[in-house]
Amino acid sequence: MKFILHNLRMIWSRLRSNGWVLAELFLVFVVMWFLCDSLGCLKYTFYRPLGYNIDHVYRLTTIIGGATSDTTLTNADRYLRALKKLEQEPSVEAAALCYWSLPMHGSNSYSSLAAQDTIGVNARIINTTGGYINVFRMSDDPQRPFVETPSGWDNVMLSQAAFDRFQKRMPTFSLDTPLSKYGDSTSVVTQGGKIGAFRTYRYGSDAPCFFYRMDENLIKRHFTDEWAQIVFRVKPAADGPDYRTNFIREIAPRLDVDDLFVADAVPYTEQQLQFEVMNGDTDKVNSQAIVVLFLLVNVFLG
């Protein structure tokens, strides 16, 4: 405290004799104000809720290969059987199978839907089974839950951001407004409810997404040999530091289907960390905090 007061007295004595010092301090004040405000915005954006929850969520790592006892099995068959087995595990609260649809994941697909033929919105496609919303604890319409949405690409649930984009361009837009595939005015896509606002990563804005529910028939017909992702939520009472180890040792062998093997269950918090490191999200806050600290030290020592 004495050190700070001493420096303030020195600054004041110099101010009385040199107007340039005042200008210099004013400039430093402006820069510091800008940096602190920017840092505050970054931290607020970084730590505000994402709109979904990844606590107790895991992603299966699967391997397909080796000798097969049933040559008629497709990848879709294997994944669906593994999903059914996983859903029956006592420690599992919810599970879902999806294609290119995980949050904080580099694999994405996009498409456009239109209202009144010409009002188009482009958004990320979420192709998944009904358990997806429960796995990530997203918010959907209790009157029109995602799990009850008819399967297929003729029925869609819009995320709040996608709904808002339509409404911005068409003020009368509602859940009863019929949609069509962009460029194909003869197609009809019926809306279900809405998915609450969420962001796919820390510094992203609310994500516009089209949610399509897939049943077994659709998956077997259109995703025969595609690579799928399986995620699941563990009951809080069953989760813990040893769950991953116990899962690999005890549960994973029960999920194997022919030549599909479950190699690991990765906590989704690790997926989040890897994604943020790759995108430099954590560095944005840390680097700016270092600059602010450096300037503060220089002000009091200079």
Language model regions located:
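Membrane-proximal extracellular/periplasmic loop immediately following the first transmembrane helix
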Residues: C36-G120, I125-N127
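Hydrophobic alpha-helical transmembrane segments of multi-pass inner-membrane transport and secretion
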Residues: R14-G40, G280-G302
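A short amphipathic helical element positioned immediately N-terminal to and/or at the very start
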Residues: F3-W12, A82
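Short amphipathic alpha-helical coupling segments at ligand-binding clamshell hinges
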Residues: T74-A82, W153-D154, D239-F247
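Short beta-strand boundary microenvironments
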Residues: Q88-P178, G183-D206, M214-H222
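Short amphipathic alpha-helices in soluble, non-transmembrane regions
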Residues: A82-L86, M170-F173, Y243-R254
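"Rare, low-scoring activations can occur
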Residues: Q160-R165, D184-K284
